[in-house]
Swiss-Prot record:
One of its GO terms (biological process) is symbiont-mediated suppression of host innate immune response. The lineage of its organism: Viruses, Duplodnaviria, Heunggongvirae, Peploviricota, Herviviricetes. SUPFAM superfamilies: BLRF2-like (SSF160459). Belongs to the herpesviridae BLRF2 family. Keywords: Coiled coil, DNA-binding, Host cytoplasm, Host-virus interaction, Inhibition of host innate immune response by virus, Late protein, Viral immunoevasion, Virion, Virion tegument. Residues 151-162 have a biased composition (Basic and acidic residues). This is Tegument protein BLRF2. One of its GO terms (molecular function) is DNA binding.
Length: 162
């Protein structure tokens, strides 16, 4: 995506311009205006609509394979948690009032459920600006835990010399 181009208008008074020049300039400005309106409707930034010149918008950050897997795992966990709660509620409703083991087994054996889950109803959904790690999104001052050490390896001994 290219940066918006800067248009430099000549400082020519309208008195010095002929009628044909003014008509040509008007047509050019109308076409530029139309193009800019279409760009704004498509979601593009318009440099002339802001009074302060803005810095160019950086391209979206590429997603690494690890970040992708983390996001998939988080989404799956949230949806599974939501589904588990809904399934439990439906199972409890279907066996409500059952008093014997045979009745319970018969109902559970023939039970068919259909549930719908979505990320809108999932708890702990981060907003777009928050980090992907739960610790980052909940407490910005939290520190990371130390990496686990293998039990088979001996810890390195550090000697401090004066």
């Amino acid at each position: 995506m290219s940066a918006p181009r800067k248009v430099r208008l000549p400082s020519v008074k309208a008195v010095d311009m002929s009628m044909e020049d003014m008509a040509a300039r008007l047509a050019r400005l109308e076409s530029e205006n139309k193009a800019l309106k279409q760009q704004v409707l498509r979601g593009g930034a318009c440099a002339s609509s802001t009074s302060v010149p803005s810095a160019p918008v950086p391209p979206p950050e590429p997603l690494t394979a690890r970040q992708r897997e983390v996001m998939i795992t988080q989404a799956t966990g949230r949806l599974a948690s939501q589904a588990m709660k809904k399934i439990e509620d439906k199972v409890r409703k279907s066996v409500d009032g059952v008093t014997t083991r045979n009745e319970m087994e018969n109902i559970l054996q023939n039970l068919t459920l259909r549930i719908q889950v979505s990320m809108l109803g999932a708890k702990g959904q981060p907003s777009p600006g928050e980090g992907t790690r739960p610790r980052e999104s909940n407490d910005p001052n939290a520190t990371r835990r130390a990496r686990s050490r293998s039990r088979g390896r001996e810890a390195k001994k550090v000697q401090i010399s004066d």
